[in-house]
């Protein structure tokens, strides 16, 4: 899957899970979603995108950082 498409999906998930939550809490939910529902290939691909890519929302950046710390990709 194309990286831009994954970034868009990740940002949409971040937006959907963010209402009434801090960025950190929303990012934790996004990380959990990615871990549970994205294939290893999708996780590897999104983690290969540089984290300073401006297309990532703030919540997405935090979620990616947290996912990298898990080291399960």
Where would I find each of the regions flagged by the language model?
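Charge-dense, helix-prone N-terminal extensions
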Residues: 4, 59-62, 72
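Amphipathic alpha-helical segments within well-ordered protein domains
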Residues: 14, 31, 46-47
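Surface/interface-facing alpha-helical segments and adjacent flexible terminal/loop regions used
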Residues: 4-5, 10, 27, 42-44, ...
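Short, charged early-sequence alpha-helical segments and their helix-coil boundaries
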Residues: 42-67
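N-terminal acidic leader/helix
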Residues: 1-24
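Short amphipathic alpha-helical interface segments
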Residues: 25-32
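Short alpha-helix boundary/capping elements
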Residues: 35-42
């Amino acid at each position: 899957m194309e990286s831009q498409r994954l970034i868009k999906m990740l940002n949409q998930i971040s937006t959907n899970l963010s209402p009434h939550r801090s960025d950190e809490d929303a990012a934790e939910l996004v990380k959990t979603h990615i871990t549970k529902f994205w294939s290893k290939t999708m996780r590897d691909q999104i983690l290969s995108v540089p984290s300073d890519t401006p297309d990532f929302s703030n919540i997405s950046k935090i979620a990616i950082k947290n996912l990298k710390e898990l080291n399960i990709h």
